[in-house]
Amino acid sequence: MLRLIERTDSHVHFFTSQDLRRVAGSLPYTLPEPHSLTAYLDNLIDAGIAPTLINNVHLSILPDSENVFASFDELQNLQAANPQRYGTVRLVGTIKAEPAYATQERLSHPQVIGARIVLHDARPQTISYTRFSDKQWLAFYQRLQPHQHLHIYAKEAETNLRVLRQIPRDVRAIIDHLGTCHRERGITEPAWVALLAEAKARGNVWFKGPGYRTSSHPEETARFVTQIVRAVGADKILLEATDAPHVGTDNEGVKYSELFDPNKAFNFVDAVATHVSKATQIPVGQLLRGAVGQLAS
């Protein structure tokens, strides 16, 4: 039997047709196809890849994260039925970061490692300086356990920065999509540079891949990853991720689903890490997954 290649996926979404029916008709675009944990695992394993750690991240179009909890049960059933095939898979989850939803009970689930704020294309000026620091949010931060993190996603670096500055400094944070840097603005975009500086000052902020939303060309994304490594440190990058099922389009209007599947996404981050390694002399493996123990210890 061929030896499987071990992989970590620090950002993926699993959801069913039943999950999607809950939001059918309420979105301004076509719903994605269902993306189940079972199909994802089978496709990777059959391709010679062994996913050893997977983070099922809250899907922004859903009103809650019940799909994340359902995936925990799904894996448990798979492992009971076929421990040889699925027994080495570890699944964790990041749930919706809404104070009313992220209760003590939900955050206490042993597989929940964090909670996600989703702001999409919210402009910086729409984020008041107290939006994420009122009484309800402060109580939520207190409920986060020391190993858990707050996951922040916005399409503008300045929006990410405004949120980050409202979070207590002892709360660990992960910034999605490399801080949402923009290829056309370059690595000197003031807001992105300020975000890196804030992250360095705090010392407990990580930047997560896979990076193809910055550019689907690895060498271009690598410029930004190199800057993160130099500004914040190689121990603050979580590059190995797929963001499956690859919703949206790239800078040239091509659907990500036409460019990537999980295997191709892993190949993409490998290529990015190779470019960064040449520029920094940091080993590829460290760039890909060196910080994963801090994500899910």
Regions found by a protein language model. Name each.
Residues 182, 186-297:
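H/E-rich (His + Asp/Glu) clusters that bind or coordinate divalent metals
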Residues 13-18, 64-67, 98-100, 122-124, ...:
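Active-site environment of divalent metal-dependent phosphoester hydrolases
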Residues 69-76, 101-109, 126-133, 156-171, ...:
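Distinct, well-ordered alpha-helical segments
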Residues 66-155, 206, 211-215:
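Active-site gating/metal-coordination segments in enzymes
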